């Protein structure tokens, strides 16, 4: 297995131009494909998850032109439901941002009835999709499980979704609601969605609603508990769509600065539609100096103190706080993060396990993690298992800000969202 050893870094300094956001990139491609008109999507992320979406769209008959550097895609919209030859199978890797929205969109009524199979890597077959399938079936969708009940692979027939009242569980993942919301306007009737339980990761729903609006569709909602969507509508291309920089990816550079230097990230700012921009506010609460601009966030180090906080609204960026906690004064508790357990891997167990290898004192609860700080000279060298999870690899790069080196196993797993992460991290790492 490939491994990468990072030597201790004495300070962090520089500017990072962020790659496009994964969740915005795949939403933009799908909306552009379903829309009337041609859309030029710019600052598209070039990564594995985006390639799975692009390959699926091509197989579904969508024409697009991708620039040589893969960051600009001109998509010719089909102006409605997908059409395909019966018996199509789409392999989506471990891309939740492709699997969930496509599962809903492929239920829309086609001109001729066809079946499609959605499948992926072994880990994808362990990632729950039951809440979405249950909701789609309430609207009349025809979906079957091919292996284990509640998990991909799925067989879907394009017999239509017919609106009406739908209940969906919001407690595990906001991607299920996102998928339903994006498909609903093209359905055969008006839909009223009621959320069961507490909706997790609300800011990701804000992203979905903002993007649907950019493509001409308005959704009414009542305090994130009920959503009303008119059926028989069309998405209209905005002609161009700029994908914001990835706020989750910004978290590693901003945290590095809070621990040991100063960094400016460009591509997101105070008006970003991504909830993970709020990560910078968490760093500020821990004591870091944060400056906001229209299209940048700058963080400068200061003495950090531990925090006790509900981070349900920023689950991806919260992982970075788990590492930052080692460098703070006093314990840190990250709460209400059960959905870490259904991501690329069970992130709660994975992070607790790898932190302990470094010598950290960690308590792992069902939906929280409690972390005690470590003195810079008390970190143990460790080989960090990454569980084929891009965010674990990027998080643990920050351990090099201690007095000891760290070895990251399978560093190439960052290709899911940020193939050039380690070279960008190296650019801001100073050793004099």
Curated annotation (Swiss-Prot):
Provide the catalytic activity annotation.
Answer: 3-phosphoshikimate + phosphoenolpyruvate = 5-O-(1-carboxyvinyl)-3-phosphoshikimate + phosphate
MF (Gene Ontology): 3-phosphoshikimate 1-carboxyvinyltransferase activity
Q: Does the keyword Transmembrane apply?
A: no
Q: What is its EC number?
A: 2.5.1.19
GO cellular component terms, alphabetically, are: cytoplasm
What intrachain disulfides are recorded?
A: none
**Main localisation:** cytoplasm
Positions of the catalytic residues: 316
Can you supply a Gene Ontology BP term from the record? chorismate biosynthetic process
Instruction: Provide the residue positions that the database annotates as binding phosphoenolpyruvate.
Output: 22, 96, 127, 175, 347, 391, 416
**Which Pfam families does this chain map to?**
EPSP_synthase (PF00275)
Recite the UniProt keywords alphabetically.
Answer: Amino-acid biosynthesis, Aromatic amino acid biosynthesis, Cytoplasm, Transferase
The record's PROSITE patterns line, in alphabetical order, gives: EPSP_SYNTHASE_1, EPSP_SYNTHASE_2
Give the location in the cell: Cytoplasm
Pathway stated in the Swiss-Prot or TrEMBL entry = Metabolic intermediate biosynthesis; chorismate biosynthesis; chorismate from D-erythrose 4-phosphate and phosphoenolpyruvate: step 6/7
Q: How does it assemble?
A: Monomer.
Q: Which family does it belong to?
A: Belongs to the EPSP synthase family.
Q: State its role.
A: Catalyzes the transfer of the enolpyruvyl moiety of phosphoenolpyruvate (PEP) to the 5-hydroxyl of shikimate-3-phosphate (S3P) to produce enolpyruvyl shikimate-3-phosphate and inorganic phosphate.
Question: Protein name, please?
Answer: 3-phosphoshikimate 1-carboxyvinyltransferase
| Source organism of this protein record | Histophilus somni (strain 129Pt)
Gene name of the encoded protein: aroA
